[in-house]
Amino acid sequence: MKRARLSGSPLLRVTPALAVVLALTVGLAARSRAVAAEQDGRAERERIAAALVEVYTHASAPDLGSPWQSAGVARYNGSGVVIEGNRILTAAHVVAHHVEVSVKRQGTTRRHAARVTFSGDACDLAILEVDDESFFAGVKPLQLGELPRLGDSVTAYGFPLGGESISITAGIVSRLEIGVYSHSGEELLQAQVDAALNDGNSGGPIVAGGELVGIAAEVLESAENVGYVVPVPIIEHFLRDIEDGRVDGFPNMGIDAQPIENKALQASLGLTDGDHGALVIRVDADSTGAEVLRPGDVLLAVDGLPIGRDLTIGVPGVGRVAASYAVRRRQVGETVKVELARDGKRLDREVVLLATRPLVPDTQHGQPSYLVYGGLVFQPPTRDFIELFEEPPS
């Protein structure tokens, strides 16, 4: 049987006039969607701006060379953001050595006295509170979001130098790794962004999808548009830390380890090409690691995360970062499992995570203690105190 193709007039014949109408209709619909998206974006920016706070600090830093006196009173400006519980989250260095702190909301003229209730110097975060409840009228606190991925768009809000009003800059997350926080010298998870950050942005919110994903912390002065952000996992760690009313900081294993990439070293430790781990070469006394580790052990995994021969771990949602993050992402006092190899045997152990207590701290936070005896002045050393007496390079 032959099949005949249907013929005749099409169901819809597009005339020139109808084509024009259709084009106009499609164009108007696209225009309407664009206008609606623009209005939504504007409303979101206004909501975030309403939660933005300018922080004014009068500080009196100690004179480390003469600990009985201060280095004088200085004035600093920074930024902050209202979060759940009518609390203001900012950077710790914005309110360091504070004598007086006041805050002002975007679009208002009145300053309100604020109290620094918690300061997490290790992660450069602080919580401020304002007793006057009218300060928070009409504010929707920013909610914490998810950790952005590499290449994700972010927006920085704050009050940087160069003007009096709010500044909004956009960029992307260009790097996510363990980095040194200049305020404390601690090595913690850190995000790098290319959004323009300047003095005064410190403590301001980094936003993605209308949610808080970071706090602006510092910039690389030798480069343009290289800013560093305290990412949301560190913010969450800090907020959980202070739930008991005190700041414990971040735990540390307290060991030094070296990669096991040399084949001769692998053979001496009885490892094959498929094995992983890090060679422990030093264990601090009274540290977390002192309970179960000793030099010569091969640390295989911590908290269920295998340690690569390059001293990195793979963390879901974060990627490969330094192995120290396996411990530092946990709270002081928590228990984690440790897998190790010793004398050819594999061992499973549990350790209680202890706070970091360096013999010589990096930075002096607060007024230093001192003792005058027999015409001599004694005070606990810190690295910034030692640097006072280092000779400048020739």
Would you name each region that the model predicts?
Residues 38-88, 96-102, 109-111, 132-136, ...:
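Glycine-biased strand-turn-strand hairpin within the trypsin-fold
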